[in-house]
Amino acid sequence: MFAVIKTGGKQYKVAENDVIDIEKLEADEGATVEFDSVLALGDTVGLPTIAGAKVTGEVLSQFRGEKVIIFKKHRRQNYRRKNGHRQFLTRVRITGFAGV
């Protein structure tokens, strides 16, 4: 069985025991988190979400992602700007589904 959850402005297709990297959640390592915004659960599709459905997970770690380089340039103007960014992420293991 699988579910589609929405968190951090993105959608993830998950199954039990999957490990996913999502946008940072304010939770400590080992904490249990619940995702209430379930868009699909098995054959059931929500409009836009499924009322009463929840997906639970366990926080494995908090970390920063790979560096993304932003480079801006204007030709013939000697204008060059280089900037780097590392996003804060949370690694979560999906432990179960509840609801429909």
From Swiss-Prot:
Example GO BP: translation
Keywords, in A-Z order: Ribonucleoprotein, Ribosomal protein, RNA-binding, rRNA-binding
GO CC annotation: cytoplasm; ribonucleoprotein complex; ribosome
InterPro entries (alphabetical): bL21-like, bL21-like_sf, Ribosomal_bL21
Gene Ontology molecular-function annotations: rRNA binding; structural constituent of ribosome
Subunit structure, as described in the record: Part of the 50S ribosomal subunit. Contacts protein L20.
NCBIfam families: L21
Record protein name field: Large ribosomal subunit protein bL21
Provenance organism: Rhodospirillum rubrum (strain ATCC 11170 / ATH 1.1.1 / DSM 467 / LMG 4362 / NCIMB 8255 / S1)
Gene name of the encoded protein: rplU
